[in-house]
Design a protein with these regions (language model features):
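A detector for small-residue-rich transmembrane helices and their helix-helix packing motifs
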Residues: 1-171
Length: 171
């Protein structure tokens, strides 16, 4: 994995900054990929519906990068280096964004509820902290970044009307 674009903090510091990006698109097996994609579908589709494709993509990519930057910073501080890959920082960023949108909508958007999303985030973080080999810093960094970006990007009337114009939907 390290030779195919997974993130090694030592390499990033040495000039391979692109690993902060490429590692988001690599996974350590089908289970790793599937777990990220299931959450991506469950949370991502309703979020894209609210924000539109452009804002959604920005939140996904920037949250993934922010998670990887926090991960690299944590590794540099602790000296505990590991190969890192996966979309979970970006996916947790989407969950952070959905949390903000749900707060703005009093806890419900489509089939999502604030309680269920909080439970999913809690279980994800709990499993990460109780198992080895999980990049908790990337999860937390992505989650926080996604929430902050949603605060900046999500303006319900503007987002809905822009999305409606793009898709031709009338609500």
């Amino acid at each position: 994995m390290a030779t195919h674009g997974a993130m090694l903090t030592q390499d990033v510091v040495g000039g391979k900054w692109y690993e902060l990006f490429t590692s988001m698109f690599l996974h350590f097996g089908i289970d790793h990929l599937a777990s990220n994609m299931i959450v991506l579908i469950a949370v991502g589709l309703p979020l894209e519906n609210l924000l539109g494709s452009g804002r959604y993509a920005v939140i996904y990519l920037v949250s993934g990068l922010a998670g990887n930057v926090l991960s690299a910073a944590a590794e540099l501080k602790t000296g505990d280096f590991a190969v890192s890959a996966g979309a979970s920082g970006a996916v947790l960023g989407l969950m952070g964004a959905v949390i903000y949108c749900l707060i703005r909508h009093r806890g419900r958007v489509g089939g999502l509820s604030l309680r269920r999303v909080f439970l999913a985030v809690f279980l994800t973080l709990y499993m990460g902290f109780t198992n080895s080999g999980v990049n908790n810093a990337a999860h937390i960094g992505g989650l926080i970044c996604g929430f902050v970006l949603a605060v900046l990007f999500y303006h319900p009337k503007e987002c809905r009307s822009q999305h409606d114009r793009q898709t031709g939907w009338i609500r």
